[in-house]
């Protein structure tokens, strides 16, 4: 059940600033299997809204076309770029990871064939219905991405 202020909907999307759209699309679209649902360049008052240095941004929404209201990953690039964030590392306060239900081994094989994702870390975690395959990889900009075996985590 959602609280009144959320209008009955779960989280719509998480936005990631990317350095290279081609490489990021190879990771999220070709590697993880997300569909491109929108690819558009917007001119707006982004300096006021986001404290950006540019009024132009490219936005690509990726996800499942059957679920337009939730679970979307937005790749964003501002004209002129943005400053790089802190280097990836151990968990810290703030943004931690993106997590996806996927066929873990198939997804790792696709990422490996595409030469994206870095060196995966894979475990079998004991769950209520038995072992659940889990792995983490890094997207092209260093974001930690968790892969959890689809259909096994909540049984």
Please name every model-derived segment.
Residues 85, 90-91:
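Non-DNA-binding regulatory cores of transcription-related proteins
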Residues 1-7, 16, 73, 100-155:
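Vicinal oxygen chelate
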Residues 42-47, 80-85, 121-129, 133:
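A cross-kingdom feature marking solvent-exposed beta-strand/loop segments within repeated
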Residues 91-97:
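Eukaryotic phosphotyrosine signaling hubs
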Residues 10, 56, 94, 128-131:
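Exposed loop/turn and edge beta-strand positions of beta-sandwich/beta-sheet ligand-binding modules
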């Amino acid at each position: 059940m959602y609280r009144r202020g959320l209008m009955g909907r779960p989280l719509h999307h998480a936005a990631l600033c990317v350095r290279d759209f081609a490489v990021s699309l190879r990771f999220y679209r070709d590697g993880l299997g997300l569909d491109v649902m929108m690819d558009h360049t917007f001119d707006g008052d982004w300096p006021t809204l986001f404290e950006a240095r540019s009024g132009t941004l490219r936005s690509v929404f990726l996800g499942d076309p059957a679920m337009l209201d939730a679970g979307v990953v937005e790749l964003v690039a501002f004209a002129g770029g943005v400053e790089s964030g802190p280097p990836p590392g151990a968990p810290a306060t703030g943004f931690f990871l993106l997590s996806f239900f996927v066929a873990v081994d198939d997804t790792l094989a696709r990422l490996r064939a595409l030469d994206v994702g870095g060196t995966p870390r894979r475990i079998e975690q004991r769950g209520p219905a038995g072992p659940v395959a889990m792995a983490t990889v890094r997207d092209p900009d260093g974001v930690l991405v968790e892969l959890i075996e689809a259909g096994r985590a909540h049984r």
